[in-house]
Regions:
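Conserved acyl-donor/pantetheine-binding loop and adjacent beta-alpha core of acyl/acetyltransferases
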Residues: 107-154, 221-223
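Short, charged beta-turn/beta-strand-edge "cap" motif at the junction between a beta-strand
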Residues: 369-371
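Short beta-strand-centered segments at strand-helix junctions
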Residues: 337-362
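Conserved acetyl-CoA-binding loop-helix of GNAT-fold acetyltransferases
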Residues: 164-179
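Short amphipathic alpha-helix that is part of the acyltransferase structural core
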Residues: 27-77, 82-118
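Internal, well-ordered domain-core segments that constitute the primary functional module
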Residues: 146-163, 172
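Extended, composition-driven regions rather than compact fold-specific motifs
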Residues: 99, 110, 144, 187-334, ...
């Protein structure tokens, strides 16, 4: 989808997976490498986006190329303002160079030019003396933010790779927080992630059918596509008064704020590092938002910078820690999940590991624990 006015639900911000077939990766000290996306990745990323059959990533080649170009400018710091930043990452098999997944950071989701719309969930309690009955009603109120948080999203993992011991979905998820910890000045103080909700077999939203469609006259896909270009209709047509969920069908009520099957793993990872349900949901499909202050995210709390040193101690290979490290290489930002021994400001690594990653002794890397 186009990058400036991306909507939330099945947008660049949502987490999901796609299917394809791949051969098992060759043996390597580092089976997978994470890096910033380049224009040469466009065709492969486009294939993933089209297999997904949503607008998690643009399915139009020109839109995807524009996204990658903007991402490259973001990594190079060549933007008018940091709020324009959009960072697209890929994970590739080190030997075959096959791309197995993507992830993204949107530096600021919610600006005067492109507001962040969401539905806030709240509870209204009422008591009748006559009936001697108490009612607690959940209601939804449309909210608008023009000074929004950073958003992590765009997490796509090819299921053919999901069972590998390297846990590439986890690598992609944690990578975004590693990058935010390395470059905190590029991002907001709070971070959110929108999760894909349950959808029908046709990838339609029951919530939209009962809510958005009745006030816009648009079907789900048409509204989703329009919102990537212009959000005016959300502001002018969606109800500004609270909507009581008890007025909706029971099956729709049960889906509000719930996570779809394809996003369960992503939610588990986010909860593990400190993100929590904000009681905010997407106004199109009622997908939930999770969030936290960046400084309170466990990975960011434990972020460290190290100088690389070859480990000549002969210590046991199982000594050390599992880490996700990031660095700026000759071709831009790269990262990898490794096993090494941190001591103070030094990271002791096997020589074969540094060689595989084209790293040199004395280089500085950022690192977070691979929990």
């Amino acid at each position: 989808m186009p990058l400036t006015n991306g909507r939330q639900s099945s947008s660049l911000g949502a987490e999901s997976v796609v299917a394809s077939e791949v051969s098992k990766p060759a043996v390597s000290p580092i089976p997978f490498l994470l890096r910033e996306a380049t224009l040469t990745d466009a065709i492969t990323i486009l294939r993933l986006a089209r297999l997904l059959d949503s607008i998690n990533l643009p399915t139009d080649k020109s839109d995807l190329v524009a996204l990658i170009r903007r991402s490259q400018r973001s990594f190079r710091g060549k933007l008018k303002t940091r709020q324009e930043g959009m960072y697209l990452f890929v994970l590739e098999e080190a030997v075959t160079r096959k791309i197995a997944g993507t992830a993204m950071i949107i530096a600021k989701h919610g600006t005067p030019e492109s507001p962040h719309y969401y539905l806030e969930m709240a509870t209204d309690q009422r008591y009748s003396k006559t009936l001697k009955t108490m009612f607690r009603h959940t209601y939804l109120t449309l909210r608008r933010s023009i000074d929004g948080p950073t958003e992590v999203g765009g997490l796509i993992v090819d299921p053919a790779f999901r069972q590998y011991p390297a846990k590439i979905g986890k690598q992609l998820s944690f990578l975004r927080f590693l990058y935010m910890a390395m470059y905190p000045d590029r991002f907001e103080d709070e971070v959110i992630a929108e999760m894909m909700p349950p959808l029908t077999d046709n990838k339609e939203s029951l919530f939209w059918e009962c809510y958005g469609k009745r006030v816009t006259g648009l079907d789900f896909r048409a509204a989703d596509k329009l919102s990537t270009k212009d959000k005016e209709f959300i502001e002018t047509l969606f109800p500004s008064i609270p909507i009581y969920t008890c007025m909706l069908p029971v099956e729709v009520q049960k889906q509000i704020g719930q996570v779809g099957a394809s996003s369960q793993g992503a939610v588990h990872l986010l909860e593990k590092i400190g993100l929590r349900f904000l009681r905010h949901v997407d106004p199109f499909d009622a997908g939930p938002y999770y969030g936290a202050k960046v400084e309170e995210v466990a990975l960011v709390k434990h972020f460290r910078r190290y100088r690389l040193v070859i480990d000549r101690s002969g210590r046991e290979t199982d000594a050390g820690q599992n880490l996700l490290i990031g660095w700026e290489g000759s071709k831009g930002f790269c990262a990898a999940q490794i096993h090494a021994q941190p001591e103070a400001s030094v990271l002791f690594c096997p020589a074969v590991l540094l060689k595989a990653l084209h790293l040199k002794e004395g280089m500085e890397v950022g690192a977070v624990p691979f929990l």
